[in-house]
């Protein structure tokens, strides 16, 4: 009797486990669908009634003597994803090169070490007043002058209450001076594995602990900024909630893919600013679900999620065509295709 009961119990147990697994799968799928719908609510609809710039004016701070490709990829990605205007702010020698890449680029060669610092401050401040969001880091470099420029730009972003993305060598500055960004809730940082480890070391966090805990503790230590930790699984956290992106991307790990993500994130951050301006009564905080209005503390969380999903989709589409020969430049034509695959045809928003 016991032998006949055992298979029945086993079947019951297996059935319960399968049911539980199916429930988790449905829950995950439901969560993803909910996140995607929330992101759509931030995207400004296209309209013939709008004028140039109303769908986003984004600044990209980067481009130095040694690096001209990164700001190009970030600027082009921001426009391909949907912002109206993208401005590259760089050194004169980098600007001369970047200008030749595309007539669509607006290149401001304001980071000039040969002029008075007060002139640099004034020129950048005047330009920042136009932006919805700014990305600091692609092609920035680590020399003293460029790091000084990054410090200036972070301060100006805070002065103008602007949404801010800090990437690449902008994170090098923050690992040395984390107080520059502490407490600023309109910032999102995009560290890769090495950059995440250095930031954790600076702030006294064990980066080898359970991954969710490490990411949340870094965001908590920064007291406001959102963190998009890039890796095999991307984690986006504001210190309270953690979102995950594990979509399959391309298998080629060529340089420049992070710049594509940063550019898309810049546009999404700009759209978050537009959404906030159009809805001045946004709640400051929310639960993990979005009501009639998306709470302010979830805007960059959703932007980071959307940028990660988009970058991985671009990489997958580009890799399917180019395989081992894939370069970052191959991702640019895929940004618009990724947008439509993820967020739907543009006509659906008209």
Curated annotation (Swiss-Prot):
It is found in: Cytoplasm. It comes from the Eukaryota. It catalyses: (6S)-NADHX + ATP = ADP + phosphate + NADH + H(+); (6S)-NADPHX + ATP = ADP + phosphate + NADPH + H(+). (6S)-NADPHX binds at residues 139, 192-198, 259. Residues 35-342 form the YjeF C-terminal domain. One of its GO terms (molecular function) is ATP-dependent NAD(P)H-hydrate dehydratase activity. CDD domains: YXKO-related (cd01171). ATP binds at residues 230-234, 249-258. Keywords: ATP-binding, Cytoplasm, Lyase, NAD, NADP, Nucleotide-binding, Phosphoprotein. Its cofactor is Mg(2+). The keyword Amino-acid biosynthesis does not apply. Catalyzes the dehydration of the S-form of NAD(P)HX at the expense of ATP, which is converted to ADP. Together with NAD(P)HX epimerase, which catalyzes the epimerization of the S- and R-forms, the enzyme allows the repair of both epimers of NAD(P)HX, a damaged form of NAD(P)H that is a result of enzymatic or heat-dependent hydration. Belongs to the NnrD/CARKD family. HAMAP family: NADHX_dehydratase. This is ATP-dependent (S)-NAD(P)H-hydrate dehydratase. It comes from Mycosarcoma maydis (Corn smut fungus).
